[in-house]
Amino acid sequence: MEQVVIVDAIRTPMGRSKGGAFRNVRAEDLSAHLMRSLLARNPALEAAALDDIYWGCVQQTLEQGFNIARNAALLAEVPHSVPAVTVNRLCGSSMQALHDAARMIMTGDAQACLVGGVEHMGHVPMSHGVDFHPGLSRNVAKAAGMMGLTAEMLARMHGISREMQDAFAARSHARAWAATQSAAFKNEIIPTGGHDADGVLKQFNYDEVIRPETTVEALATLRPAFDPVNGMVTAGTSSALSDGAAAMLVMSESRAHELGLKPRARVRSMAVVGCDPSIMGYGPVPASKLALKKAGLSASDIGVFEMNEAFAAQILPCIKDLGLIEQIDEKINLNGGAIALGHPLGCSGARISTTLLNLMERKDVQFGLATMCIGLGQGIATVFERV
């Protein structure tokens, strides 16, 4: 079976969804920009030699509809002979795109693929057009489709206090701002055109969503966002609304060597699981355990983790049950996470994987794991091994 390698991984800056840098930039343009950039950065691979493009996106309507993967590829002037498909596993969409491409390569049906994802949550809101079947309440809790309430449930089940949530959220902003100041994101962010507050066109090379002034004291003043009477989860301890895209060049190890391209990491294992929709945020725990089992590893073998921060109330129980609560500052989201950077749904799986690869290189560790929860009760995880 072919070994699957990541040759390159990039992303746009994360733009604020409300009046942010990409308020006048479409999702297809963010995607096409990264497709062009990946090909330009790796000229040994001719675009016509791509076997497929797998692109994650959740809200596939309006500008993100009608197979945005193909629309973006056409905008990027990828040869018409190269196919493209849009993948939807909600929050895990672009990580699923990676898994789909990896399996094609493993079986010999492909040698080189572009994968990634996008979400413009400013142009296409998360709840746009959502219409749950009324009979679904006979099978799952009525609030299972309300992500914030599932996070509240997890926090109560695992003894996660409001103070713990506020502290974790403040850490996310502090870590992300420190990474920005030290240029830790420089290797992954591709400068992308947008508009400043005055409407002037400029190139953005930083994440505008981070709030460096965030403190535990300020977070403590925020009101609960989802359960006003008894809740703990606030806007400050939830993932920010942002716009962005991320992309990876995925190849068979043999083809990469043929072309003289240096792989950055192998895909060691992949896993997707389901869980109770009422605690959808718990999905990373069984997904990570299954991915580790497939890789023949344990959590202690992993040098760094990227765990998507949907909510502080959600990620802390996952960290706790993976036995990592004492290692947060050494291994978990060392450059901050979605609470500070935002969670553009279809983008995030590729985004956290891209950040993980850079952290693995900087920390000089052999193994890394990226994982995320998925709405309505799923989890997805990928173990990477440096080459």
Swiss-Prot record:
The keyword Kinase does not apply. Belongs to the thiolase-like superfamily. Thiolase family. GO terms for cellular component: cytoplasm; fatty acid beta-oxidation multienzyme complex. It is found in: Cytoplasm. Catalyzes the final step of fatty acid oxidation in which acetyl-CoA is released and the CoA ester of a fatty acid two carbons shorter is formed. Involved in the aerobic and anaerobic degradation of long-chain fatty acids. The keyword Cytoplasm applies. Pathway: Lipid metabolism; fatty acid beta-oxidation. The active site is at C91, H343, C373. It comes from the Bacteria. Coiled coil: none annotated. It catalyses: an acyl-CoA + acetyl-CoA = a 3-oxoacyl-CoA + CoA. Heterotetramer of two alpha chains (FadB) and two beta chains (FadA). Keywords: Acyltransferase, Cytoplasm, Fatty acid metabolism, Lipid degradation, Lipid metabolism, Transferase. The gene is fadA. GO terms for biological process: fatty acid beta-oxidation; fatty acid catabolic process; phenylacetate catabolic process. Gene3D superfamilies: 3.40.47.10. HAMAP family: FadA. Its EC number is 2.3.1.16. GO terms for molecular function: acetyl-CoA C-acyltransferase activity. This is 3-ketoacyl-CoA thiolase FadA. Induction: Repressed by FadR in the absence of LCFAs (fatty acids of, at least, 12 carbon atoms). When LCFAs are present in the medium, they are converted to long-chain acyl-CoAs which bind to FadR resulting in its release from the DNA and thus derepression of the transcription. Signal peptide: none annotated.
